[in-house]
Amino acid sequence: MAEAFLQVLLDNLTFFIQGELGLVFGFEKEFKKLSSMFSMIQAVLEDAQEKQLKYKAIKNWLQKLNVAAYEVDDILDDCKTEAARFKQAVLGRYHPRTITFCYKVGKRMKEMMEKLDAIAEERRNFHLDERIIERQAARRQTGFVLTEPKVYGREKEEDEIVKILINNVSYSEEVPVLPILGMGGLGKTTLAQMVFNDQRITEHFNLKIWVCVSDDFDEKRLIKAIVESIEGKSLGDMDLAPLQKKLQELLNGKRYFLVLDDVWNEDQEKWDNLRAVLKIGASGASILITTRLEKIGSIMGTLQLYQLSNLSQEDCWLLFKQRAFCHQTETSPKLMEIGKEIVKKCGGVPLAAKTLGGLLRFKREESEWEHVRDSEIWNLPQDENSVLPALRLSYHHLPLDLRQCFAYCAVFPKDTKIEKEYLIALWMAHSFLLSKGNMELEDVGNEVWNELYLRSFFQEIEVKSGKTYFKMHDLIHDLATSMFSASASSRSIRQINVKDDEDMMFIVTNYKDMMSIGFSEVVSSYSPSLFKRFVSLRVLNLSNSEFEQLPSSVGDLVHLRYLDLSGNKICSLPKRLCKLQNLQTLDLYNCQSLSCLPKQTSKLCSLRNLVLDHCPLTSMPPRIGLLTCLKTLGYFVVGERKGYQLGELRNLNLRGAISITHLERVKNDMEAKEANLSAKANLHSLSMSWDRPNRYESEEVKVLEALKPHPNLKYLEIIDFCGFCLPDWMNHSVLKNVVSILISGCENCSCLPPFGELPCLESLELQDGSVEVEYVEDSGFLTRRRFPSLRKLHIGGFCNLKGLQRMKGAEQFPVLEEMKISDCPMFVFPTLSSVKKLEIWGEADAGGLSSISNLSTLTSLKIFSNHTVTSLLEEMFKNLENLIYLSVSFLENLKELPTSLASLNNLKCLDIRYCYALESLPEEGLEGLSSLTELFVEHCNMLKCLPEGLQHLTTLTSLKIRGCPQLIKRCEKGIGEDWHKISHIPNVNIYI
């Protein structure tokens, strides 16, 4: 890693020399000497990096160099910080403070020179080759698309495993467990993902769950992870007992499919404890595990272990070729020949093939490919894992600036889902990113990440709400760890986590020069001068540590770049925090007691990211527009006085997302234009909201018109706007790239913009609109296709809305999949050919409900909270032969269900809850449900008995009845009047 950081250091030294800062402190001669020494050392680093694998002395030498480089960087940091302070205070060279500073730094420089002389002299003993290291030109940003690579050679294995899982019949109480065994990098997880996503698995099981286990087989952690996977949301901290109960409720009667990926646990008792909780599932539930250890297969498996073999030479070549030649129509025959020789060395291991393919896609000279083929790394001693030489080769052929960025990823635990933007901010904090012309560091970091992804170092990419998350294969993580530890010493960049006071004292004693510290739990007591001891700290993570007051000594951390205070109870920040002139990121996410920031916040001259989401700020700090480096500002509260107005945003080159609140304080359109939103090309998400009191309705239309965003915008929210119409810029040209729109509380807008013309719009949510709106699109005859990309449509609170479009015409809503209609009592559904999920909330008249039959492709239907309907029309379920899931809840006056239920031949789950007046289930209606596997009836107090036809539903595997007092006795096992109707069902659960 040292060679890449040296380039950053040399850039800084050049800046100091050219900027004559060395003259200010009298260190120009020393700076030039340092630059010369590092340049000489840098010339041999490429050779040293390769030879350290064989020679421990060279590895130790690189560690010493790494330490020295960071110490010099600290000195430069101090000089830059002091220079800024002197400029602000208008101090001269002969001021006592200047003299004192120069004396202290001069002493450190002298010691540093002696260290570097020794390091430079020691390098002569190794006879290292000098090489010219060219800085890589800026990489192209255009055309990069995240795609899932094609999998080769595992179709047969996928088919075999799917058949085992589907055809397996277990007559014991134990849930069958199928282990997949194979060495690291062989593709066990990839194969498990193929099985998990197989259509046959989706159709066979009621519930699919995926959990990554890794080294930590902790029952509480795993149960929590399983529950979170089922519910699709994070849980707070819970004790084991309530977690076990919650999981059993979720699995009860379900034919679930659970994947436990990357299992290392060899403790039989731990598995027995978890298995006991998982028994509750319905007959046919199955568990699939992946592991490298055969012993684990015998401990956990109940089915015969599935041994995964190596890929064939042909499939391995296809995998390599996919990455190395990347859609090229013409390829060099010689490169093809060398490539096949390299593939032979991969030994049929997919991870090796795709990683080397990712490496060679950036190399087109025959000599470069031959260098990889003939590298000595193939001949180094290895353990049983044959993939390591390929991974090491890939690392050593990375460009300089990518090596340390990749190795730094070792600070994250294995199997961590890492946020891309967070990682880039940490790279910046440690000065890993080399500036390139006029490119912003964030863009440089994005290019580095993209290239590492293309080289197959990152996987399992997931994009949510505009943010990218990813993981690293555990063998790739092992590689990062080995490369990172080779460059680190006690002067480590590693993330040290503090769990208690004892940890704190140990770190204070042994790691005073740590660069990264995180508090994983609250530290009950600390000295106000706590942070003074960590003079080199660059990253400080205090998130969710229950700090109520931040020690003012944090202001002494002059090298601090990244400060995470998210999730704490702090009410205010110390003024001394504003002395941190190198601070780049201040994360205050979810600090729910924080109402204001220090008035001197604008002095944080290096601040690039200010995260304020879910902070109840009543105002912004004054003159935030002075933070010209600021790129991320998630939240802005408009003020009425100068220094607090929208004009503060004018010169900020913001990116990402911003929420602007209290726009009612903007007096006119001229003031709104000062925000200069139309020039912010890197802003992808914009939320604008007004507060209801003190509204100036006549001005609000002009204000919103003046807040026109840049055409690059992707997400737009307008909340509680009081004007009588939405702006003209909400048309095709300005919002041509928008994928999601939310309009809420705009009760005076009598008509809606032509959303149907937006070519990229995928999600549209309209809430609490005007009583005058009758149609989402109220234009004349439609000749062009409308809403070409819309997949989700949520509409609520439009009491006179009659439908989607007044006029019919060309094909409309061609890809719409999900609809939610709430509190729109007059709404009638048109004929739509692609809708699969529908939720209806609130009142709806008979015509509206019967028009559901126009949605013939529905697979899921939920009807909630209709307090007036007493029956559902027979026409309602006509044409819904594709329906798989039906839920009817909180229809408090519903007395009966239609017999047309019988037409739902593919229905698998019927869920009826809180229908207090329901007296019976239709005899004829239930008999026709030939595919039904699950029936839930809850809190239907008037339900007197179960229909006779229930006993003919041979596919029914799970029945759950709760809160139906008249059924409890009738369904009593063996003696109840209705027991014969349900005795054939494998899983029956009846609760009071």
Swiss-Prot record:
Coiled coil ranges (UniProt) are none
Record: residues binding ATP: G182, M183, G184, G185, L186, G187, K188, T189
Query: Would the keyword Nucleotide-binding be found if you checked this record's keyword annotation?
Result: yes
Q: What is the effect of changing L782P?
A: In susceptible haplotype
List each copy of the NB-ARC domain by range: 135-437
Q: What is the effect of changing F890Y?
A: In susceptible haplotype
Stated consequence of mutating R154K: In susceptible haplotype
Q: Name one GO biological process term.
A: defense response to other organism
Where do the LRR repeats start and stop? 534-556, 557-580, 582-603, 604-628, 646-672, 680-703, 758-783, 787-811, 813-837, 855-879, 881-903, 904-928
Single Gene Ontology MF annotation = ATP binding
Q: What is the effect of changing Y775F?
A: In susceptible haplotype
Induction section of the entry: Constitutively expressed.
Q: Which UniProt keywords apply?
A: ATP-binding, Leucine-rich repeat, Nucleotide-binding, Plant defense, Repeat
* Annotated effect of mutating N879S: In susceptible haplotype
Miscellaneous information on this protein: Belongs to a four-gene family located at the same locus. Although the four genes are expressed in the resistant haplotype, only RGA2 confers the resistance to P.infestans. In the susceptible haplotype, RGA1 and RGA3 are likely to be pseudogenes created by deletions and mutations, while RGA2 also contains several modifications.
Q: What does this protein do?
A: Disease resistance protein. Resistance proteins guard the plant against pathogens that contain an appropriate avirulence protein via a direct or indirect interaction with this avirulence protein. That triggers a defense system which restricts the pathogen growth.
Q: What family does the Swiss-Prot or TrEMBL record give for this protein?
A: Belongs to the disease resistance NB-LRR family.
The protein's name is Putative disease resistance protein RGA3
According to its UniProt entry, this protein's organism is: Solanum bulbocastanum (Wild potato)
Question: Which gene specifies this protein's sequence?
Answer: RGA3
